């Protein structure tokens, strides 16, 4: 059987708010699609990870499904972290002070990438990038998350405010005319990502669940 769920208006934020933010080596990808996946992701935003979207063909199938439009990525923004790795993506253990100019940890030496493909991807990395950048799919590779108007509060500990800042392009960036698998189930909102002008996470969401005692 194929995994063929449809995800719309998702915001995925990793721990890397800026170049200097230290993060665990366990962080890898904002999204990793594998094992003959047929899922679709629409009107969604991802940032803050060493890698963006990984189509993992270690067990082949997902890459071809992507090229055949069975696995669909539409109206998705992958945003980097300013000055991280020279391309907005880098290793978790990046060191900046005193790094040699030709060293693996130098700020201008890319280590991660927005779009990552497995060696088994049909046609290789070039085919992946070309299909992702198909004009009709309306996908975006953004140099830094600040360009989107994402609320920086989302990187903080404790109670956050996920509502995009005033004037954010996220508030009006959604498109639905190229999302054939969305169907009637999804409410066709104008905003891209999980939150528009209303903070629907308040007051029921618990942002400190790792320290709260539940009885």
Model-identified regions with their sequence ranges:
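Extracellular beta-rich repeat passengers
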Residues: 1-215
